[in-house]
């Protein structure tokens, strides 16, 4: 059985920087955000269902999903959002499980902003939370995405609170300092996870 480490953290916490360091160590990273884009690529059953349900004006000239238009369509309509989630969540889950089965590194990172909210942690042996104070989350996200403060705060509210996330963590990676500090922590965790995979196989 593949040893899976679930990585999560609030918006702006630096999940991508952390998982990139694991990748440099030869570890397979399955990113739920990337999977969510893969399941709606041209030719997929999900994209066909979305076009039938919402109309073809949600497709670009190239036949790709206009994600911004879709977000606007479902943002203020809970029923449509539920319909979309009931279509996408099972497809994303299935694709994640397929990629987990195909992974060949000693252990696998499953990175998902909503790992805990969407119960993806049930596929993981460990949960690693990338953590920064909420003020820093806000500051980093506004700088990175050039988003209005209110929009970032709304996203943060929709996610688990920092306190609730930390309660569910097996491991915590503090990311309020430098990239060197992040790298050191990743290296330590990497050794721990390698040891855990060996123990699991014995």
UniProtKB/Swiss-Prot annotation:
Give me the segments passing through the membrane: none
Reaction catalysis annotation: 3'-dephospho-CoA + ATP = ADP + CoA + H(+)
- One Gene Ontology cellular component annotation held by this UniProt entry: cytoplasm
Q: What is its EC number?
A: 2.7.1.24
UniProt GO MF annotations = ATP binding; dephospho-CoA kinase activity
Q: Does the keyword Acetylation apply?
A: no
Keywords associated with the record: ATP-binding, Coenzyme A biosynthesis, Cytoplasm, Kinase, Nucleotide-binding, Transferase
Q: Which Pfam families match?
A: CoaE (PF01121)
GO BP, sorted A to Z:
coenzyme A biosynthetic process
Q: What is its main location?
A: cytoplasm
The family this protein is said to belong to: Belongs to the CoaE family.
- What role does this protein play? Catalyzes the phosphorylation of the 3'-hydroxyl group of dephosphocoenzyme A to form coenzyme A.
> Can you name this protein?
Dephospho-CoA kinase
Classification of source organism:
Bacteria, Pseudomonadati, Pseudomonadota, Gammaproteobacteria, Alteromonadales
């Amino acid at each position: 059985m593949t040893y899976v480490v679930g990585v999560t953290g609030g918006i702006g916490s630096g999940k991508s920087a952390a998982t990139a360091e694991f990748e440099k160590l030869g570890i397979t990273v399955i990113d739920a955000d990337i999977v969510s884009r893969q399941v709606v690529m041209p030719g997929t059953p999900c994209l066909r269902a979305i076009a039938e349900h919402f109309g073809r004006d949600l497709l670009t000239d190239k036949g790709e999903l206009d994600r911004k238009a879709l977000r606007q369509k479902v943002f203020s309509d809970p029923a449509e959002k539920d319909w979309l989630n009931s279509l996408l969540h099972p497809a994303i889950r299935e694709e994640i499980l397929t990629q987990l089965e195909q992974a060949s590194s000693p252990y696998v990172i499953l990175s998902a902003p909503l790992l805990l909210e969407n119960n993806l942690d049930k596929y993981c042996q460990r949960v690693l939370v990338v953590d920064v104070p909420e003020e820093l989350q806000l500051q980093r996200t506004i700088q990175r995405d050039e988003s209005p403060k209110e929009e970032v705060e709304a996203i943060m509210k929709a996610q688990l609170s920092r306190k609730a996330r930390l309660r569910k963590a097996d491991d915590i990676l503090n990311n309020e300092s430098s990239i060197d500090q992040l790298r050191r922590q990743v290296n330590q965790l990497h050794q721990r996870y390698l040891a855990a995979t060996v123990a699991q196989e014995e």
